[in-house]
Every structure is written in C-alpha cells, then in structure tokens.
C-alpha cells in the first residue's frame, strides 16, 4: 500500500510531515487544517493541484500544505 505524505510548513513554526493511507484522507486533512488556519489568522485558503496555501489579504503566506505521493 502506498503512503501519501502531507508536508506542512508555516512561517515562524517550521515544518512537519504527516502520513496517510490514501490520497482522499490526506486531501481532507489538508483542507480541514487550511480552513482552520485561515479562520484563526484572517487569511484565505487557495488550493491549486497538490498544494494549499493560506495567505493574508495582502498576499503574505501564513502556511502551506503539499501532497507528496510515493
């Protein structure tokens, strides 16, 4: 079974890697976390391909999630 990794990085917080059993679970977790961060920090989540970026209205990036399929 292939493992799907999500790489999370945030300015001032460093980075972390999370592993999921399938792509659907990984994407659901990314979207949930991105919404939460956007709500807490007044940003907006933008999903493009295998990546979600949360940024403030001026464009300053708050956090990023990248899907890595193995």
Residues covered by each model-derived region:
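Short, mixed-charge low-complexity intrinsically disordered segments
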Residues: 35-70
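Short aromatic-glycine-(Arg/Gly/Cys) micro-motifs in beta-strand/loop hairpins
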Residues: 1-16
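Short linear proline/tyrosine/threonine-rich motifs used for host-factor recruitment
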Residues: 4, 17-19, 54, 64
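Short, flexible N-terminal segments of the mature chain
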Residues: 14-38
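Broad hydrophobic/π-residue packing in well-ordered secondary structure
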Residues: 2-4, 29, 56
């Amino acid at each position: 079974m292939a493992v799907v990794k999500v790489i999370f990085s945030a300015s001032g917080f460093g980075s972390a890697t999370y592993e999921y059993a399938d792509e659907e679970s990984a994407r659901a977790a990314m979207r949930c976390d991105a919404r939460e961060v956007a709500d807490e920090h007044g940003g907006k989540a933008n999903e493009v391909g295998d990546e979600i970026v949360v940024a403030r209205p001026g464009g300053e990036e708050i956090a990023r999630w990248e899907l890595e399929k193995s």
